[in-house]
Amino acid sequence: MRLKGGVVMKKRNRILSLLLAGVMALGLTACGASNAGAAADETGSAAVSTESASSDTAASGEKIINVGVTNTIGSINPLLLNGGEINKYATGLMFLPLMELDADLNFEGMLADSITTEDNKNFIVHIDDAATWSDGTPVTADDVVYTALRLASPVIGNTAMMYYVFEGVGDDGFVEEGAESIDGIQKVDDKTVQFTTKEEMPITTFENSYARYLLTLPKHVIEQYSEEELSTADWFNHPDVVSGPFIVTDFDVDHYISYEANKDYWKGAPKIDKLNIKIVDGSQLYAGLQSGEIDITQQTMSDIPQEDYESVEALDNVDVVYGSPVTNQSVFIQTKNVPDVKVRQAMLYAIDRQQILEELLNGHGEIVDGFLSSASPFYDDSLTPVSYDPEKAKALLEEAGWDGSQTIRFYVNSGDSTFVNAASIIAAEWAAVGIKAEIQTVDFATLMSVAGTEDYDVLAVQYTYAPVDPYPDVAWLLGGEGSWTGYSDDTLNDALTKSQLTSDPEETKELFSVVDKKVQEDVPMFSAYVISAQGAVSKRITGAAPSVYGFFNDVQNWDVVE
């Protein structure tokens, strides 16, 4: 899906808004560290109050599970949803998405039971016939269409949903103010909705970028509110009609969210009575798991510090699960400022990435070149990562006429202690071959501000590329002028374009292999390592397992056995 002409920057900016939301709030541990650090100063009193409440109710015989996370939650209003997984998961416990990925990266029906297309432009969404609201009213196509219309409202102004892809929506992602319908999102019958896109897209892109993020609202309840009121209506703070397994009872978006079971959940009443999401600093997760105040953590929402991994593994009361490698410690090179490909190649050859993985992450991860890891079905395992070869690096620098006078400005997130250490190793290895680097350690907000300029040479951030749908991220990051790399290539662009015109997994794999090989060759970015993050679950819990995707899909089956 190529973006052309005057629309390009509008669409790029829309993509960037979603990507930044994802980088800042998704399970990216860089963000988790910075957010958690900010929240930690205030966490104490809130944590005490929710813990004491949990103890009282547990004593009365209620079953309660506490989930520990390190990312703050912006809002629980589905119309204000950003690209972050914690935001989506916390809200999706009440308002189901149409589809969700499961632990094996298959799309699983949540509110919908099928999504089909014959032409990659018209997507037919069928709502599960059994789906009902907690007040007994059936979930219908009217609810889905109404929610989509409001998500595209310029009055509400959600900047993350990228609805510009649908017919009838402007290139800014919004409909006209006061619009009563969207041409590209139409009711077919009571349980069927047709979504029509302006250009072809693979069904996986539709499912991953749109079906997973459309959290349907009950039209019959909230149509009483004007568009202006929907952003601030108090109803969203304590909704009384939901489609999901839980209903929020209390929350502080910086500290906790408390839920009670929806006993009328149409997929089956939850086995537990209450669920709490506790937002804590990463350094508090080990103590919480040890004491039993936290029952479960998830690999991307719960940033257990690397230095605590062995301690968590040693706990007798929890089982540890390492997630699939999805969080890519990406290092972006601004090619405008480092234009010689041989210099960029030398920068990669000079780094002993395997040693960094073993020493700083205890081997919990992998080394890849490009964007895709072994977690993706499109990963090409025949692509051998560039090996550590400082002599090759020196030779390339000599061929490039590198005189060592330029100092590489290397921006790093101060909240990611592991990569702060890795950056020091990288800078030393660069120095050993004749590349001077000055590490600029800044907070995450500053890092993102710098990323929006070209005033850097190298910038590192943890980034999760959706394994089943990497296109939006890759297309932006290699989008030429204005992107984090400033890099563009015709062969690569052609492969990306073709990836949007096929639904054949093998062809898609071949096309993304072209992309990763070109990235390996030209080095506009490189992966320092890909993290297999740690999750843990109390042995008193059944039916629950930490997983990168699908964590809450069957939360109604979670149970307490003690």
Task: Give names to the regions the model predicted.
Residues 253, 398-465, 505, 533:
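Ligand/substrate-recognition segments at binding pockets and active sites
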Residues 140-147, 190-196, 244-245, 273-274, ...:
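Alpha-helical secondary-structure segments
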